[in-house]
C-alpha cells in the first residue's frame, strides 16, 4: 500500500526517550542498523601501531566499510588488505578454504612480505563454526617466516566476553618472545600514543640512565621484539 510522502511516522517501539532509557541496555536487543561510518579510534588504528605488519580482514562488504575508511584516512592503504566473503561462500560451507586461499593470494602478490599479519576474522566465522585452528595452522605452514596474530572483528559477540578492541590489545603483545629481564629497561604497554619527551615516566627512567620502550615508538620489527 502506498503512503503519502511526508506522512507522520509512528516511532512507537522504535525510539526510547532518554528519561526512559535504562542501563546497561537502553534498547531491546534486535535487528540493528550498521551505520557506514567509523569511530575516532578503532581496531585499525590500534593494529597499525605494530611496525612492519599488515592487516588482513576477511569479511563481507558491509563490515568492510568502516575499516577501509579508517585505512584510507590514515593513509596506510599499503599496509591494509581484505578478502571479501560472498553469499555463495557461506552456502558452500568452505569458509576455511576461502580464508586460507584469500590470505595466501594477498601475501603471494606482495613483493616484500610483512614480518607479521594481523588476520581479522568476523562474526560469520563464529556463526558457521569455522575451524580457525586449521586456518592458522595452514597459513603458518605456508608462510613460516611470518607471524600470524589472531584478531577478531566480532562486535556481535561482545556481550559474552571481551570486545574486539580488548582482544586486539592483548593479541598484539602475544608474539613477544620471553627474554631475560633487563634491569635498565622499562616497557610501557597499552598506550595508543607515544608519551611526551618530558613525561614523568620518561624523565624518571632517564634520570636512572635507563631505556624507555613503548609500542607507539617502535620503528621496526626489531624494536617491537625488544619490548
PLM region spans:
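An N-terminal assembly and electron-transfer interface module characteristic of large anaerobic redox
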Residues: 1-227
Amino acid at each position: 500500500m502506498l503512503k503519502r510522502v511526508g506522512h507522520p511516522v509512528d516511532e512507537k517501539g522504535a525510539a526510547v526517550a532518554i528519561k526512559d532509557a535504562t542501563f546497561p541496555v537502553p534498547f531491546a536487543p534486535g535487528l540493528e542498523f550498521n551505520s557506514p561510518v567509523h569511530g575516532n579510534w578503532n581496531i585499525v588504528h590500534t593494529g597499525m601501531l605494530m611496525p612492519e605488519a599488515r592487516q588482513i580482514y576477511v569479511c563481507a562488504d558491509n563490515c568492510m566499510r568502516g575499516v577501509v575508511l579508517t585505512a584510507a584516512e590514515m593513509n596506510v592503504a599499503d599496509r591494509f588488505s581484505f578478502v571479501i566473503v560472498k553469499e555463495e561462500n557461506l552456502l558452500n560451507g568452505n569458509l576455511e578454504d576461502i580464508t586460507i586461499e584469500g590470505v595466501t593470494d594477498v601475501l603471494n602478490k606482495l613483493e616484500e612480505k610483512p614480518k607479521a599479519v594481523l588476520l581479522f576474522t568476523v562474526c560469520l566465522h563464529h556463526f558457521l563454526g569455522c575451524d580457525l585452528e586449521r586456518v592458522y595452522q595452514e597459513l603458518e605452514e605456508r608462510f613460516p617466516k611470518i607471524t600470524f596474530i589472531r584478531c577478531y572483528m566480532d562486535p556481535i559477540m561482545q556481550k559474552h566476553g571481551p570486545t574486539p578492541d580488548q582482544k586486539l590489545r592483548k593479541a598484539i603483545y602475544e608474539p613477544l618472545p620471553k627474554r631475560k629481564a633487563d634491569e635498565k629497561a622499562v616497557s610501557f604497554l597499552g598506550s595508543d600514543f607515544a608519551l611526551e619527551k618530558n613525561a614523568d615516566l620518561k624523565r624518571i627512567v632517564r634520570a636512572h640512565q635507563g631505556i624507555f620502550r613503548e609500542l607507539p615508538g617502535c620503528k621496526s620489527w626489531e624494536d617491537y621484539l625488544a619490548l
